[in-house]
Amino acid sequence: MAAGYRSPTACGRSPLASEGALGIVRFFMLFSVFYLSLFLSVGLLLARRAVPDGSAAVIVPLGCGFGVSLLAVLPALFAVVLGFTLPTVILAAAAAAGIGAALLYRGTRLRGMAKDPDSGALWACLLPVVLITLYLLHTHVLHLVDGAYHTGQSCYGDMPMHLGFIKYIAQSGEFLPRYPLLGGTHRFGYPFLCETVSSVFVVLGADLRTAYLLPMLPAFLSVYGMFWQLARRVTDSAGKACLAFYLFFMGSGLGFVYFLGSADSFAGIFTGFYTTPTNFVEKNIEWVNPIVDLLIPQRATLFGWCVLLPAVYLLWRFCYEGERRLWPWLAALVLPLPLLHTHSALALVLLCLVGGVYTLAQGLRRKTLLPWLGLAAVCGAAWLCQMLPTVLAQSLDGQHMLRLHFNWINGQDDGTLRDNYFWFYIKNIGLVYLLLIPAFLRAKPKQRWLYGGGLAILALAEFVVFQPNNYDNNKLLYVWHILGCILAAQLLVDIFAEVRALPWRALGLAACCFVGMFGSVLTVGREALSDYRQWSADDMALADHIDENAGSDALFLTSDSHLTPVFALAGRRILCGSGSYVYYHGMDYSAEYNAMRALYETPDEDTLAAWDIGYAVFDSSVYAKFAADESWYAARYDVWYENAACRVYKIK
């Protein structure tokens, strides 16, 4: 290797050139912020129109949900015809502006919103969690430290995949996109709209970090704000909403007990890799913290909940409070949900089915049934159009997808359970699970019906698995858990309200909060301290060179490391991606894997031509896995790029 090589794209610029490049980066960043602001402004107008009685504490998070939904829908609609290109992104902005202008013409204004005495409680409740989230996003997403990109524990595995999908869709312009982690043409059976909401900013010229983070900010505000508003609407109490919020986002089970045996064991929480009170596989503890292990690393979950939680809020008002006029707004909000997060779409269907049964139980009346039929018709048509060529087709003919399996990850393939069914959930979920039955019995009838939708989700998730990884059924189980936290918080507040002595009331609530949240506090602390180098300066230089010199449709021969910068940072197609991605997406990748191994260990020109390989990469990950014959390539092809970490040969 050329140890002294300096990439012209990463080093050696004059100070004047560097300042000019920095100015361009700032311009595109500001332009991207303006673009996002347009969609969020229209989202706020839609929220204001949907719930004209809402205060700013409702309109802001609900508007973020509408804005992100628009950001997913509008570019995708134009991209079907024009590809995912700059004209598509511009037309999407024009369409959003047109919707906003129409709303303004109809008299929709953001001023004059209702006053809400509980709005201060909302923002005070959200502030600590928002600050934690912002810090973790800063340190976990392409965090530049001493010239290298660093990340935290939870993003080390999933984020390279998301970065690669985002970059691939933007730089290729393909829509519907091909699956870029395998050679040839494969269906993209993953809900990719959670990636296109960032791809738009890459198309606009933003750097990858900015593009990745920008839409996540309103998405988090929607998730946090609308959870709180849903809980307050259901319980009619700001205090219960605050407790429910922390029971869910900072809740945990009894996993912390396993670390109290010694000082070394407790210290291991903060130094080990996934040895936390909410993620300790050795002891069958896998009910993870939703902030650090679901929302931050898993974009589909974040953007799914960004739409799902506002949708459940509207569903509560539409179904259980009789506001039938809300059905068109609910339908508009959830249009992209199947390709944002398929599990959230399925959860919403089950909640709506139970809500529909509740409506029928109140009596057959035309004015109550027609809105349900309208909602079903609009969503059914829109969702089927999205799902038939993508996630639904993948579920039906993908590898190890739709199948029967009992009790989530506690169930084993031979039908036995690792732990007793109830003990498994007691030690994983803890206090909330123990309170579910008394909380349900104490709940009001409408609350029981809503939770009945959660029980339908639980029943389905406990018997049917929808993907190769049994663990991923937690995307359904957490929706059930959301509703359980709301009922449990209501029960706790009601019980302790009957304790007259204020010190005892405070002590009792504090004890419950400690038992119900201590594990997550430790987990979040571990995540904040975690720091791993993800890509070196040489990896970044390689990605820069590919960006500037390789064709958008080039296929690279690389190792199947999940960190390969060819895909993760440059967004180029590779012959065979990591099994931790492609297997769990239901793909049959045996042909690509065998070809990858053969092309490294026993290469021949016919196989290269058959797979249409454009470039072959040799780096430490290749030599760690294969007995690679680089000399064969060196004798036949020119070195296209070289630095201290890799050599790349141009095949054609």
Regions found by a protein language model. Give the residues of each.
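Transmembrane alpha-helix segments characteristic
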Residues: 130, 325-336, 351, 373-378, ...
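Hydrophobic, aromatic-rich transmembrane alpha-helices
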Residues: 310-318, 351-362, 427-448, 494, ...
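Membrane-interface alpha helices of multi-pass inner-membrane proteins
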Residues: 292-295, 314, 327-342
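Hydrophobic/aromatic-rich transmembrane helices and adjacent perimembrane loops
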Residues: 217-220, 301, 346-349, 469-497
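Perimembrane helix-loop-helix junctions
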Residues: 315-325, 330, 334, 347-379
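Extracytoplasmic
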Residues: 500-652
